[in-house]
Design a protein with these regions (language model features):
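Switch/connector loops and helix/strand junctions flanking conserved nucleotide-binding motifs
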Residues: 17-19, 49-51, 75-80, 104-109, ...
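Extended helical scaffolds that flank P-loop GTPase cores
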Residues: 93-95, 120-238
Length: 239
């Protein structure tokens, strides 16, 4: 337990994409949906933020209190980079804490924020990431149309409805099975998704990925001053 008698929750590192087909995504979401943790500390590598925010967005859709920890900020600053923390918090709707785990910098502040969001159950303030890339609002309408159809099913299954709707668009059969939809509902959902694909000119999975990556690009563009690449990063990129 960490202070205040609140059980410590697992730390999730955003080092992989939570696609419908990865074991990491399945284990992560099964734990969060099934165990209902009081909060999540999501640790990402500050020197490679753009790559690591995809999982963060998917975790936010699970509607669980979360703090985003930007690790290795000392290295980022040493290479001439920085992050506009307040701006990033405003755009994501969750607390963002710069830390250096290796030097034990910012860790106390991270724990304080984690305890606060867990105690008061402060959930992510933003879960709709549709932006200007969603020409005519096709993805937005698709997700919200599905939400309207599955609200009762999601509640009965204990699955956050926005997360469930997004996963249905991505073709996640585990979520579909958990929702126990009837054939008529499945056909209506398929019709909504096909209509979205036609409007966007992208298949369903690509449309969702495009939505997320566009938001990440906008977020990084507005909040991150990118550092010079270290020798280690250059070698990693070449590999």
């Amino acid at each position: 337990e960490i202070g205040l008698g609140i059980p410590a929750e697992p730390l999730f590192r955003s080092s992989c994409l939570m696609s419908p087909y990865t074991s990491e995504e399945i284990v992560t979401r099964q734990f969060i949906i099934g165990e209902k943790p009081t909060g999540i500390i999501n640790i990402v590598d500050a020197t490679n933020i753009e790559r690591n925010l995809y999982l963060t967005m998917q975790l936010m859709e699970l509607d669980t209190p979360m703090v985003l920890a930007l690790n290795m900020m000392d290295e980022m600053r040493g290479n001439g980079g920085t992050v506009r923390i307040n701006k990033m918090e405003a755009m994501l709707g969750i607390p963002v804490v710069p830390i250096s785990a290796a030097k034990n910098e910012g860790v106390d502040e991270l724990v304080d924020h984690a305890l606060h969001v867990a105690k008061y159950q402060e959930r992510p303030g933003r879960m709709d990431f549709c932006g200007e890339e969603d020409h005519g609002g096709a993805v937005h309408r698709c997700i919200h149309g599905i939400i309207h159809l599955i609200e009762d099913h999601a509640k009965a299954a204990g699955i956050p409805v926005r997360f469930a709707a997004t996963k249905l668009v991505e073709g996640d059969q585990r979520i579909e099975a958990a929702l126990k939809l009837d054939q008529n509902e499945k056909e209506m959902i398929e019709h909504i998704i096909v209509q979205m694909e036609q409007e966007r000119g992208l298949d369903r999975a690509a449309a969702i990925a495009d939505m997320r990556f566009h938001f990440i690009h906008q977020l990084v563009e507005q909040t991150v001053v990118k550092p010079r690449q270290s020798k280690e990063q250059l070698r990693s990129a070449q590999i």
